[in-house]
């Protein structure tokens, strides 16, 4: 109602101003034709004027034929003598002046207009939901609307333990006496920790949908922006809003943007982010009570958060939200598949087994890609084949059918990928090969993909050395068969070297150097750690480490070489099969490894088989080479052109290696994902 009257008064003022301006610039003119003073004087001299009315310097009159007219008289000209001399009736009137109020309004109108515009902009800057320039000290926390689409815990699957902990917080808000009668206190803060895409923000939205209390949400980057000093003010305002709406929940997404370890930057205590963090620490557990305000935050970098932020009393609970296991993946797939029309052949458990390391967001994307692929083919339901194609697209990238590659490079790529596959299948305990292809995907010319039989969280020394041998298989196949070395194995060598060095320096897998950690963990500057790195390895120890790394790589290089030498016939058969079909699956690889000829080992081609369309054998200039994006424990091996392309190869070992790193070092988890 107030808004109605405000708008009504605004339109009334606008209408009044328009009337004033109209009256000002469109003053009514007297009746009759306006003539020049010369014509008027001539008419008087000829006796054609019978009567006139003088209003200041304006003269109005009637001619002898009865027509009215008007004219202007020059200043300091005595008109009355001429008029009296010719017998013209004269009537003198005071000129119609502008009313006093109108004169005041006209004189003050520009100033009043400027004042009104200034007031308008000041009100706009001080309001507008925190978006005004004068509201930079106001919190940008948004209150979740009741009209927003609600998410409940039934929409969250695959992370049951995290759901249970957060459901307890919701129950406390709904029925606090149940816990208080035994002396229990509600947690002041809950920190959701986990890799990207695991459902941390979705859990927060589920809390908002279940708690039935005010829910404020904002990002960690909303505190520190353009102006200096507003971060602390926004924190204070955020908690003021929370206290007014208590009991309530405040959710801060990506809290590492504001909660990083203090002392990392060059600004010291005057750093804007540190000032904001200090205010956040005080508000969460300081002199003033924040009873009824529960903080929920999410981050995928808990290692860089300030210890004072993580202590009990601030974030009492740290809820880990990991990547789902096979059971969790099955549940997540079923949640997303409920929104898609499916064929009877689709089995969520089979898809879950083939997607180890996938997060909830990855699985949602997989279902969406499968639906898009089916829609492009004008299907009425999504079939299992669509999910298989979507999985290949997500893991390996979209096939580049337009890429033109010379026959020589195709042959090099085929032997490179066959080398990886033969070594992987020959090693006992290695992850089985799922698919081998020389179809360019993304920025890769080919790849070998392995899938583990089950979820894997740790790796033994034997498995890591097997991975190094698999990495060496591509280069060795080129060397043994084609008698050449290409840049395609460059990334294989780099990853094998990195893995061997981690085995020595991080995992203590050296017989001579012992179970020790050598060198500081690699930390990025400004991420909550010291700027300088202290060297903790002597030159003698560094030489011994280099020797150990070389020994591990060389030993597995020779191991892979022996395997390929013994399986040379299989290597030739598999490479020829790749040149013919471009893609072979797990069953075909197993039959080829058993010594079956390609004629019986390879499946008949389908009409729409992706292997039926081969790239034109024309010289290609690939230019840039990059890594293949794959999931944890998922394989990919890339071979590049021998002449002008910088090598960059990725095999299953890379994914396995990075998963090992992610289990033992938090920074490895972030880099991998």
From Swiss-Prot:
Biased composition (Basic and acidic residues): 661-673
Pfam families the UniProt entry points to: AAA, AAA_lid_3, FtsH_ext, Peptidase_M41
The protein's enzyme class: hydrolase
Subcellular location: Cell inner membrane
GO biological process: protein catabolic process; proteolysis
Classification via InterPro entries: AAA+_ATPase (IPR003593), AAA_lid_3 (IPR041569), ATPase_AAA_core (IPR003959), ATPase_AAA_CS (IPR003960), FtsH (IPR005936), P-loop_NTPase (IPR027417), Pept_M41_FtsH_extracell (IPR011546), Peptidase_M41 (IPR000642)
Residues that bind Zn(2+): 416, 420, 492
EC number(s) given by UniProt: 3.4.24.-
Gene3D superfamilies tied to this protein: 1.10.8.60, 3.30.720.210, P-loop containing nucleotide triphosphate hydrolases, Peptidase M41
Topology relative to the membrane: Multi-pass membrane protein
Primary subcellular site in the record, as a coarse category: membrane
Cytoplasmic side: 1-7, 122-673
Residue numbers annotated as active site: 417
Keywords: ATP-binding, Cell inner membrane, Cell membrane, Hydrolase, Membrane, Metal-binding, Metalloprotease, Nucleotide-binding, Protease, Transmembrane, Transmembrane helix, Zinc
Binding site for ATP: 194-201
GO cellular component terms listed in the entry, alphabetical order: plasma membrane
Example GO molecular function: ATP hydrolysis activity
Co-factor(s): Zn(2+)
HAMAP family found in the cross-reference section: FtsH
Subunit description: Homohexamer.
Protein's name according to its UniProt entry: ATP-dependent zinc metalloprotease FtsH
Species the sequence originates in: Magnetococcus marinus (strain ATCC BAA-1437 / JCM 17883 / MC-1)
Gene transcribed to yield this protein: ftsH
């Amino acid at each position: 109602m107030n808004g109605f009257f405000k708008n009504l008064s605004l339109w009334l003022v606008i209408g009044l101003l328009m009337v004033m301006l109209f009256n000002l610039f469109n003053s009514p003119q007297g009746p009759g034709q306006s003539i020049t003073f010369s014509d008027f004087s001539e008419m008087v001299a000829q006796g054609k004027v019978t009567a006139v009315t003088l209003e200041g310097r304006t003269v109005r009159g009637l001619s002898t034929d009865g027509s009215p007219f008007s004219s202007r008289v020059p200043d300091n000209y005595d008109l009355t003598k001429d008029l009296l001399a010719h017998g013209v009736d004269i009537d003198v009137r005071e000129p119609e002046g502008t009313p006093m109020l109108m004169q005041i309004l006209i004189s003050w109108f520009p100033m009043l207009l400027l004042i009104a515009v200034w007031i308008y902009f000041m009100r706009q800057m001080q309001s507008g939901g925190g978006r005004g320039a004068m509201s930079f000290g106001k919190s940008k926390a948004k209150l979740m609307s009741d009209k927003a689409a609600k998410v409940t815990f039934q929409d969250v699957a695959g992370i049951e333990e995290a759901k249970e902990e957060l459901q307890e917080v919701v129950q406390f808000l709904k029925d606090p006496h149940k816990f208080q009668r035994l002396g229990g206190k509600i947690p002041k803060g809950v920190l959701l920790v986990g890799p990207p895409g695991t459902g941390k923000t979705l859990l927060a939205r589920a809390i908002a949908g279940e708690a039935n209390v005010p829910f404020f949400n904002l990002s960690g980057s909303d505190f520190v922006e353009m102006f200096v000093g507003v971060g602390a003010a926004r924190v204070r305002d955020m908690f003021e809003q929370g206290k007014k709406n208590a009991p309530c929940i405040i959710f801060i997404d990506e809290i590492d943007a504001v909660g990083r370890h203090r002392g990392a930057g060059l600004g010291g205590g005057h750093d804007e982010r540190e000032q904001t963090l200090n205010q956040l620490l005080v508000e969460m557990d300081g002199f003033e009570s924040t009873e009824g305000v529960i903080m929920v935050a999410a981050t995928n970098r808990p290692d860089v958060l300030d210890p004072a932020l993580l202590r009990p009393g601030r974030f009492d609970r740290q809820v880990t939200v990991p990547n789902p296991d096979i059971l969790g993946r099955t549940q997540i797939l079923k949640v997303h598949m409920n929104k898609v029309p499916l064929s009877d052949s689709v089995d969520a458990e089979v898809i879950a087994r083939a997607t180890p390391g996938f997060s909830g967001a990855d699985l949602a994307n997989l279902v969406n890609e499968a639906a898009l692929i089916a829609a492009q083919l004008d299907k009425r339901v999504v079939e299992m084949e669509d999910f298989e194609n979507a999985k290949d697209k997500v893991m390996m990238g979209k096939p580049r059918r337009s890429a033109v590659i010379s026959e020589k490079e195709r042959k090099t790529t085929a032997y490179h990928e066959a080398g990886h596959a033969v070594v992987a299948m020959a090693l006992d305990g290695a992850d089985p090969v799922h698919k081998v292809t020389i179809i360019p995907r993304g920025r890769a010319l080919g790849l070998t993909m392995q899938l583990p039989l089950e979820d894997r969280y740790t790796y033994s020394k034997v498995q890591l050395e097997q991975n190094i041998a698999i990495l060496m298989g591509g280069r060795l196949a080129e060397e043994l068969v084609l008698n050449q070395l290409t840049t395609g194995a460059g990334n294989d060598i780099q990853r094998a070297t990195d893995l061997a060095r981690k085995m020595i320096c991080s995992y203590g897998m050296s017989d001579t150097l012992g179970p020790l950690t050598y060198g500081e963990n690699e930390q990025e500057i400004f991420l909550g750690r010291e700027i300088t790195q202290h060297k903790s390895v002597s030159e003698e120890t560094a030489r011994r480490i280099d020797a150990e790394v070389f020994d591990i790589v060389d030993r597995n290089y020779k191991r892979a070489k022996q395997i390929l030498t013994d399986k040379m016939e299989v290597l030739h058969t598999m490479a020829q099969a790749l040149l013919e079909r471009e893609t072979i699956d797990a069953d075909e690889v197993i039959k080829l490894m058993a010594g079956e000829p390609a004629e019986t080992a390879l499946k008949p081609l389908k009409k729409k088989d992706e292997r039926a369309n081969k790239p034109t054998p024309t010289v290609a200039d690939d230019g840039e080479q990059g890594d293949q994006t794959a999931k944890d424990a998922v394989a990919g091996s890339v071979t590049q052109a021998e002449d002008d392309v910088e090598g960059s190869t990725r095999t299953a070992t890379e994914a396995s290696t990075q998963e090992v790193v992610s289990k033992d070092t938090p920074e490895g988890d972030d880099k991998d994902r």
